[in-house]
């Protein structure tokens, strides 16, 4: 489509039909397996080229809308059997984690709060706003406290060469230390790699009472090594 329209691939957008239900299911899934504060925002309205314009609507509302369009004679997309949406044959199998959450956990939560979808999505939006703000603060601290060893003016650093965290990072609030360290590790490991909580904690432990712990050494995921002295971590 981008080639047909004569625009760069980076300007392309993929629109999905994810709904409130999908977002709530993802929230419970992450609650069960564990996640960071940002993970509790669940699905985002936009992530790169992926856009999710229906996150404020329930799955049932979307289905009702399609049926109203069909019944009123307006254009809809349907398969040869007239189905307006496709049900995956595995949806009823509780061996799949999402299906278990969808069939067992969410319905019971809805019994306690019939407005669960609206309530929980509103909560996730509040979490997202605060997460965005903290991320902006962390970006500022990242620029202040992180020095890449291979950094050259006008060029992207060679992240695998390592970096130094300034001694003064230890004086920042622990939540901001973790966010800066998380970004550093993501840069070094690559954005396809999941940063382990233990790795973040191991680096933060190199600071104590607002300064680096001289002589501290440890190893992390991805064969990364950490050491600390009065010059930094």
Residue ranges and their predicted role:
Residues 8-17, 21-127, 135, 143, ...:
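Catalytic subdomain that performs nucleotidyl-dependent activation
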Residues 1-9, 13, 188, 228-230:
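Short intrinsically disordered, low-complexity coil segments enriched in acidic
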Residues 4, 30, 108, 184-188:
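Active-site catalytic microenvironments for nucleophilic, acid-base chemistry
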Residues 45, 121-233:
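AMP-forming adenylation/ATP pyrophosphatase catalytic core
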Residues 1-2, 62-66, 181:
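Structural element of the ATP-grasp superfamily
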Residues 5, 69, 73, 112, ...:
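Solvent-exposed amphipathic alpha-helical surface segments
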């Amino acid at each position: 489509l981008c080639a047909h329209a004569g625009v760069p691939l980076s300007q392309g957008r993929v629109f999905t039909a994810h709904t409130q239900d999908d977002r709530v299911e993802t929230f419970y899934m992450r609650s069960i397996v564990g996640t960071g504060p940002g993970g509790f925002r669940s699905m985002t309205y936009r992530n790169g080229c992926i856009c999710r314009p229906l996150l404020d609507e329930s799955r049932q509302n979307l289905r009702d809308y399609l049926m109203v369009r069909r019944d009123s004679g307006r254009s809809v997309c349907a398969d040869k059997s007239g189905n307006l949406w496709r049900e995956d044959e595995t949806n009823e199998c509780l061996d799949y984690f999402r299906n278990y959450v969808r069939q067992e956990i969410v319905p019971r939560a809805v019994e306690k709060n019939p407005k669960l979808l609206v309530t929980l999505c509103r909560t996730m939006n509040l979490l997202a706003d605060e997460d965005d703000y903290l991320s902006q603060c962390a970006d500022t601290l990242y620029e202040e406290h992180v020095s890449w060893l291979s950094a050259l003016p006008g060029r992207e650093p060679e992240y695998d060469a390592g970096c130094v965290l300034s001694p003064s990072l230890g004086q920042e609030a622990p939540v901001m230390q973790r966010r800066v360290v998380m970004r550093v590790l993501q840069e070094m490991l690559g954005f396809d790699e999941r940063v382990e909580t233990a790795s973040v904690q191991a680096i933060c432990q190199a600071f104590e009472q607002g300064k680096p712990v001289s002589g501290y050494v440890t190893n992390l995921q991805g064969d990364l090594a950490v050491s600390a002295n009065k010059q930094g971590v």
